[in-house]
Amino acid sequence: MDDEISRALEANRNFYAALERRNIGEMEECWSHGDDIACTHPGWHRLDGWDEISRSWRAIFANSRAWRVRCEGERALVSGDLAVIFCLEKLEAVGAQGEPARMQATNVFRKESEAWKMVHHHASPMPDVEASEEEDTVN
């Protein structure tokens, strides 16, 4: 099982490498190409199926500046042919001033022909820590 966790984590790192390089060919390699997959980019509605997801990555890559992407705090769970990875994304435009954007992400991979392929990606902004500490979210 440790070997499968390592392979799933490698697939996750390949996804973030493709994202950082804004390389659509590498991104295509990371994903399953079925109709049963989904992606939710920060601030977007859910996209279903490879056609929609592929179009979204092409638009994002065409309309964005070069950036650095770091994936931190990876936690992986593997069960059968599914792997779930939780992580923190830090995205920073090259040459930009200020703090990088911080996203919390959940990535789900399915084993297809001995390779881990992404079937779900969901990223959303991290909550403001100071504001969330002031709120009483548990009653």
Question: Where would I find each of the regions flagged by the language model?
Answer:
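A beta-strand edge to alpha-helix "cap/lid" segment located at domain peripheries
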Residues: 2-29, 36-139
